[in-house]
Curated annotation (Swiss-Prot):
Active site, UniProt feature: 157
Name of the protein in its database record: Uncharacterized oxidoreductase PA3106
GO molecular function list: oxidoreductase activity
Residues annotated as binding NADP(+): 15-39
Length: 255
């Protein structure tokens, strides 16, 4: 449940990959806290639809984060519309080719994954920095616990998220003290819509893999993102926060 407050107080945040899942959850939470939120996504139809559903404090901009020209143009649109930028959440990512064996992994698939998941956040930081600096803003990069542990055939995704953690502390060093930069690494987060969850509910075994006894929700991620963007986190930068219910700290033995 979102606890309403005015921590955002009219500030402006840009959230990428915001048309669904974690990005949509972050956007909704920030709006509830009083932020103006720009939802960026390469899915124009869905992005415009969800922005309209979120109400007057949501605004949509189409963007492929791996295309420098689109990033530059979209950031300029945001500034033209709002005149300021206080927060950047780099959430857009692709997992493919997550289950492609290394022998079958094409260079194009590898390159596209790193372009979206790693180059994208760099480009966004590059073009947003002058405006974030003017308001002592903050950046939150959405990484993954896959930067620390892997399943087979996940080379591209794991490498991109590991790189994003390194980019995070490099940006924190380069952009401080004016801009704070942190990373948040989700574990298993149930991003499915209500109908999907009802049709295929999670099992007791799914929940038991976590020390807290349940799979995560988008609100678990969104609430921490909101704190990291706020002045309450003013002494926090260059850090990674794992939001995984303790899953990466639990030893599991299969019978």
């Amino acid at each position: 449940m979102i606890e309403p407050n005015l921590r955002g107080n009219g500030k402006v945040a840009l959230v990428t990959g915001a048309a669904r899942g974690i990005g949509l959850g972050i956007s909704a939470w920030l709006i509830a806290e009083g932020w103006q939120v720009v939802l960026a996504d390469n899915d124009r139809e869905r992005g415009a639809r969800v922005a309209e559903a979120l109400g007057e404090h949501a605004w949509f901009v189409a963007m492929d984060v791996a295309q420098e020209g689109q990033v530059a143009m979209s950031v300029a649109e945001v500034l033209g519309q709002f005149g300021r930028l206080d927060g950047l959440v780099c959430n857009a990512a692709i997992a493919n080719p997550r289950n492609t064996p290394l022998e079958a992994l094409s260079l194009g698939e590898w390159t596209r994954t790193l372009a979206v998941n790693l180059t994208g956040p760099m480009l966004l930081a590059k073009y947003c920095t002058p405006y974030l600096r003017a308001h002592n803003g903050a950046i939150v990069n959405i990484a993954s616990t896959r930067a620390h542990q892997s399943e087979p055939d996940s080379e591209a995704y794991a490498a991109s998220k590991g790189g994003l953690l390194a980019l995070t502390h490099a940006l924190a060093a380069s952009l401080g003290p004016d801009i704070r930069v942190n990373a948040l690494s989700p574990g298993w987060i149930d991003t499915r819509e209500a109908a999907e969850r009802e049709a295929a509910p999670l099992t007791e075994l799914d929940h038991d893999q976590h020390l807290v006894g349940r799979v995560g929700t988008v609100e678990d991620v969104a609430s921490l993102v909101a704190w990291l963007l706020s002045e309450d986190a003013g002494f926090v930068t260059g850090q990674e926060f794992l939001v995984d219910g303790g899953m990466t700290r639990k030893m599991i033995y299969l019978d």
